Regions:
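Sec-dependent signal peptide cleavage junction
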Residues: 19-35
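Beta-rich interaction/scaffold domains
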Residues: 50-245, 539-620
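Catalytic domains of carbohydrate-active enzymes, especially glycoside hydrolases
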Residues: 246-301
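Substrate-binding cleft/loops of secretory-pathway carbohydrate-active enzymes
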Residues: 359, 364-370, 426-454
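Substrate-binding cleft of secreted/luminal carbohydrate-active enzymes
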Residues: 452-540
Length: 620
């Protein structure tokens, strides 16, 4: 999905120069600037006026000024054609985040003395490197080009159009020509959707007992391209009519994601996690159970590791590097050590994931493996790239080949059997060429439909919307020689995956298997583990009430705050009501009716009116 974020500045005076979103407030610390050091002092001595200004700076502002003044990307040593982007981009991004955290008076002072201009110039050069390293030749690029355009516009407004052209020459020669490709991508999507819908309609119209009719529809399906087949929503009906006994053998992993924030207030105990993974094993018996286990979550400008380190770890020094420590505090949450001991004994493999922020990934790896590397269950380390050098939603930086290779080799130096996984919803944030045995993970969400016939949470133009299965196919096709993991099951997708055959976890995974050529894995996100259509045995009465209220919210008909289904049924969406909307309403009614009287009485009364409205709308 093309998820979007806002570019926000804390100060009106620097609004147009705010190229990266604001970070969380905190004391400024000086990072390791090895890659930023200049070989010669080419900075002129400060004037008396500048000295006076500097004396007015707080210690934090002075530190930020020193950091910006030393950015190597603004020196003659910088070679734009050959520079490795991560060596220059990361210091600039950190400097911006620290600048945005300064009080408004300090920001104004650094604007007045020219420091902010130096920062924006550095950001402009980084943007040029980003354009240089992005193919800008496929539909996936649409998920990042709008960010590039906003950043170029901000540079242009802050520094002037002529300076922007000088610092970002690839904007005109490489970026702008991409716009000429967009109509072709949109037409291709329309053609693929049309072809898929024609076959889908034939599937629904055929008599499954008529062998000739089934064979004819099967021929229609086989004549589609691989991508067009991903637009066929009801292929399972044809599969059943053909009596095809698919083994879905390319699904070789199954499991769940675990986070301190995903399950709500009450966590699962080790044997309860195993009940969930046992159910997945029943659905996918050929798979290795794996857990995507978040051990380091975003905190402030860095990463909080959820354990108490050994006494020889200098936690104060690490805090200055944006690495913090605290034990999880959710009800029923045991220490990670206790979970891993249980997983050791039950053949459950674990990938330890971090949301690094501005923390150094290699350092995080060392700390985590020093703590847990003796557990046989540990299979590797994962990085959620959405939070790599980013602390606001979707502001993380793309991982270059050099960076991916560095992390991969670092992990394998610890244990050659360990694997790295990299997670993002857009392939352009993942290494363009370096592969090794990296697991690539897609956690895209917010789709309006499985096949791109309706707008999703983040969408504006239906012609740009691929849909769940086509988008995941685009992702997996980008890494044909590597295993991929699909982190799926987000609540923002329930309004369409609830309409699939029960069990929905199996139906969703099977269709993903069919559009995937290589080995893959199904990772169910913890947000909807406690859900009536996924793993209902994990639900308490409070969980049943919570999930029912959430589902009722999908039927809200309000034009501004409503749910996707509710708005379509109310006629206030740009999309018409769809046949699957009727199925979803029926599913919600079944769930409400399954509640006890006490649970029904605890539901939000206003949300219950949404169901009344929806049932009336589909009955018309």
């Amino acid at each position: 999905m093309k998820k979007k974020f806002l570019l926000i500045s804390l100060s009106v005076c620097v609004l147009t120069a705010s190229i990266i979103g604001c970070g969380s407030a905190g004391a400024v610390t000086e990072p390791d600037t090895t890659t930023q050091e200049t070989e010669a002092d080419d900075t002129a001595a400060p004037s008396s006026q500048e000295t006076e200004v500097n004396q007015d700076l707080s210690a934090d502002a002075a530190s930020v000024k020193k950091m910006i003044d030393s950015l190597a990307i603004n020196t003659d040593a910088f070679q734009p054609d050959s520079a490795e982007i991560s060596e220059y981009r990361e210091p600039v991004t950190l400097a911006r985040s620290l600048f945005d955290n300064l009080p408004e008076e300090d920001q104004k002072t650094l604007d007045a003395d020219g420091t902010l201009t130096l920062l924006v110039q550095a950001e402009a050069r980084v943007l040029n490197l980003w354009i240089r390293d992005t193919p800008l030749d496929s539909v996936e690029d649409g998920g990042i080009t709008w960010i590039m355009e906003e950043r170029y516009d901000a540079v242009s407004e802050a520094l002037g159009e002529d300076t922007a052209k000088e610092l970002v020459p690839l904007y005109e020669t490489k970026f702008l020509p991409y716009n000429d490709l967009i109509p072709g991508f949109q037409e291709e999507k329309r053609e693929n959707l049309k072809a898929g819908q024609e076959v889908d309609a034939a599937i629904l119209d055929m008599d499954p007992s008529d062998a000739d009719a089934v064979a004819e529809v099967a021929k229609m399906y086989d004549n589609l391209t691989d991508m067009q087949q991903a637009y066929v929503e009801h292929y399972s009906v044809l599969r059943d009519a053909l009596n095809k006994k698919e083994d879905f053998s390319n699904i070789i992993y199954s499991g769940t994601r675990s986070s301190v924030y995903g399950l709500g207030d009450t966590w699962l105990l080790p044997d309860e996690w195993k009940q969930v993974t046992d159910q997945l094993q029943e659905w996918y018996p050929q798979t290795q159970t794996i857990m995507v286990w978040i051990i380091g979550s975003l905190s402030g400008m860095g990463c909080n590791l959820e354990f108490t380190p050994s006494s020889d770890v200098d936690t104060e020094a690490l805090a200055k590097q944006y690495i913090y420590f605290s034990e999880p505090d959710r009800e029923n949450h045991l220490s990670h050590e206790e979970y891993f001991k249980y997983f050791d004994d039950n053949n459950i493999k674990v990938y330890l994931q971090v949301e690094p922020g501005f923390a150094d990934v290699d350092t995080l790896i060392d700390l985590i493996m020093d703590q847990y590397g003796d557990h046989p269950c540990i299979a590797g380390i994962g990085v959620d790239v959405e939070w790599y050098h980013g602390v606001t939603e979707d502001s993380g930086l793309p991982v270059s080949d050099a960076l991916a290779e560095k992390w991969d080799k670092h992990i394998k130096e610890i244990n050659p059997e360990y694997r790295l996984f990299l997670k993002h919803y857009n392939i352009r944030y993942l290494p363009p060429a370096y592969r090794s045995d990296i697991l690539f993970v897609n956690d895209s969400q917010g789709f309006g439909s499985p096949v791109g016939d309706a707008l999703g949470t983040y969408d504006e133009n239906l012609d740009d919307v691929l849909g769940f299965f086509p988008e995941f196919k685009h992702f997996t096709d980008a890494f044909p020689d590597n295993d991929v993991l699909y982190q799926i099951g987000y609540a923002s997708d329930e309004s369409w995956f609830y309409t699939m055959d029960d069990p929905v976890v199996l139906s969703l995974g099977q269709r993903l298997s069919e559009v995937t050529k290589q080995n893959c894995g199904i990772i169910w996100v913890d947000f909807t583990i406690k859900d009536p259509k996924t793993f209902p045995f994990t639900q308490s009465s409070a969980d049943r009430i919570k999930s029912a209220n959430r589902l009722l919210g999908c039927l809200n008909p309000d034009e501004e705050e409503g749910g996707l289904v509710g708005k379509r049924l109310a006629g206030v969406s740009s999309d018409p009501a769809l046949p699957r909307d009727t199925v979803f309403v029926e599913k919600v009614r079944e769930i409400i009716d399954s509640l006890t009287d006490e649970e029904k009485n605890a539901l939000d009364p206003e949300r219950l009116t949404y169901l009344d409205f929806a049932e009336s709308a589909v009955a018309e």
